């Protein structure tokens, strides 16, 4: 059945037709009786229909009407089911009967019979009619679609493009309007009230978005840097290097790059502007904010690039936020950074290793690129040192928007600053009025998660006796969607507590903070050249850092800072400025990069602070052991290959050995997986590592083999989210692992390792024990300095200069579980990935070395003499 509805004035007239298929070439429309009034209308309509001969087929007849408006009404609805008469739109009277006619395509009949219209049945009748309308609507849509499909199939032929007509010369060829395809808008199926609701929701969404954009633009104008826009641009044009000093929240990071784009520094998209950040979280979050302000898609005009992740578009991105290490690596492919018109080194006061090396390299290329602009952004008072390094270049000061902050010290030192911080949180929460959020500085992910758990336990016990509290963590390995929660507005009658690392000192601006709790500690890497080991230490902050932390409380109004240390400690125990990373870290990766760029005299390379001679000497020694340098200190072919990988030289050596060494060939795929997993282990597990390990493998002897098995099982599940949930693994972390692995695989393919590995793999098969032995040998070749030996009192480090340091296996390691809880015999030799000092020296991510001769086979220049000497001493 098909119904056609037209309007005459305000009265709706329903016309219904029954379509009967006579043959493949003709369609006849006959009126269907729907009562006297409808039958009369249908007959009138049918009498107006005429048969029209098709120009394409003289035997084919189409139904047509000469009534203009009604012709269009007839098109798409002739094959539908019966529509309801307009009388059903009015109040239902007694003895009405609703019948759904059987359609052309043989669908089952949908009949609804109604009882007499006594007043007590009016509600029931109304409900049934409503259901019948819905059923009829579905039937009409289904019948129409099936009929269109049959029509299309009926017109098919073996050669649909070959049209042969008898007597074709007798016809004029024009586009026949009867052959047009009828379409319906998806909104046509909406009831009037539904359409009104849809349009209202759409209008509201558009209005909300317009208000949001206007709010963003208004907020931009309120930032302190906005009033200095013209003056700042003039100074940039006048000077090749400019130091910009401004407090966190002044807008220099987000607004200045936009000013440069608006002023034409990108030459209509031909050039880019690079803004470096010391941390991944800052690069990604700031890029997202700027893209939002510019009303563009993140990854197009505005993008970011961090290690193992590139969210930019070639020939499209003009603003690129990136970690300083990523810009440093671009020197390998473009030593003059020719695609950039301006480079902004943001948060330069943090003095990361990559930032210091970048500044030295940029100082060298500035004379070669006179049009390149260099902006050094700093939030502290050490801007003068940067100015002196660049021949006393000018300093532009952007005043911050800062309210007074009251500083509170403890009367005596606190033995447990975590416990003291939790106590202070509830002290503020229960005594201070709303609004006013709390920012707590902690040293790392473990402290943050432990504090978060404790706060949630206490809040659950307090229940409704205190105001609601929202706890939001922020640290580097937190998934990005969870990181963004710290920027969400705090609901009314609620307080937000942000648990953060030192990333919140300057890199991020969090609105709504009125209270800061500062234990005064930070976690730093400390490299000891004499032992050749890097330790992760928790150390006191500098005075500059704690002052920056206090300033976070004065962004939206007068605030308070609670320091969990005494004023005497602040004045006498804290260093004035933090130590530059270049003076306290392993420089092997940096030295290799500089040598690959052609820097031969490391002593004379321009640096703001010089590393110690022992540190440089130890780095050169490590590179020589890895085979990256020859005996003359010149970079080797292997060393140049290592530079192609976005990871430490030690990991690059592992991958190289896995594909080329005759005793290890064929395990590149496994080593790629393990290396990728080791980059993300801090955020890999939900809860305890041992629980996840037990669900993956019943028995495993090493952390490295556990990581390999986790990835393999996840891959076998087709990278399933549910598999991760079942095995207590972070799904987002595994996605990052997969991205890292893909990038490392592409690098391996580029330097020819994949082809060599495939050839060797065919010879060794897939025996697990054989594969694991080769994996262990590969890691020995890459980390010969990270091997400990079991002694009378436990494990001790090896090496002539670094031997004898007592270390313990960290409780999170599988080795600890095997030795302490399963009483398995400890292995004589163990390789570790990280040495950290907390209550004592711990080693993490451990790999068992079952055979002593593997050490001699893989690194004879170190272990042959060491093992022989110990053997001889034992015999004496």
From Swiss-Prot:
Intracellular or extracellular location(s): Nucleus
Residue ranges occupied by any Helicase C-terminal domain in the UniProt entry: 424-598
Modified sites of kind N-acetylserine: 2
Catalysed reaction equations from the record: ATP + H2O = ADP + phosphate + H(+)
Residues involved in ATP binding: 246-253
UniProt entry keywords in alphabetical sequence: Acetylation, ATP-binding, Hydrolase, mRNA processing, mRNA splicing, Nucleotide-binding, Nucleus
UniProt domain Helicase ATP-binding: residue ranges: 233-399
CC annotations in GO: U2-type catalytic step 1 spliceosome
Entries under Pfam families matching the protein: DEAD, HA2_C, HA2_N, Helicase_C, OB_NTP_bind
BP term (GO), one: snoRNA splicing
Renumbered residue ranges of the record's region Disordered: 1-111
Molecular function terms, GO-annotated: ATP binding; ATP hydrolysis activity; ATP-dependent activity, acting on RNA; helicase activity; RNA binding; RNA helicase activity
UniProt EC number: 3.6.4.13
InterPro entries: DEAD-box_helicase_OB_fold, DEAD/DEAH_box_helicase_dom, DNA/RNA_helicase_DEAH_CS, HA2_WH, Helicase-assoc_dom, Helicase_ATP-bd, Helicase_C-like, P-loop_NTPase
Record note on what altering residue 378 to L does: In PRP2-dn1; 40% of wild-type RNA-stimulated ATPase activity; splicing activity abolished; accumulates stalled splicing complexes
Subunit structure and binding partners: Interacts directly with pre-mRNA. According to PubMed:2251118, associated with spliceosomes prior to and throughout step 1 of the splicing reaction. According to PubMed:8943336, it leaves the spliceosome before reaction 1. Interacts with SPP2.
Note: Present with 172 molecules/cell in log phase SD medium.
Function: Involved in pre-mRNA splicing. Is required together with ATP and at least one other factor, for the first cleavage-ligation reaction. Functions as a molecular motor in the activation of the precatalytic spliceosome for the first transesterification reaction of pre-mRNA splicing by hydrolyzing ATP to cause the activation of the spliceosome without the occurrence of splicing. Capable of hydrolyzing nucleoside triphosphates in the presence of single-stranded RNAs such as poly(U).
This protein's name: Pre-mRNA-splicing factor ATP-dependent RNA helicase-like protein PRP2
Organism: Saccharomyces cerevisiae (strain ATCC 204508 / S288c) (Baker's yeast)
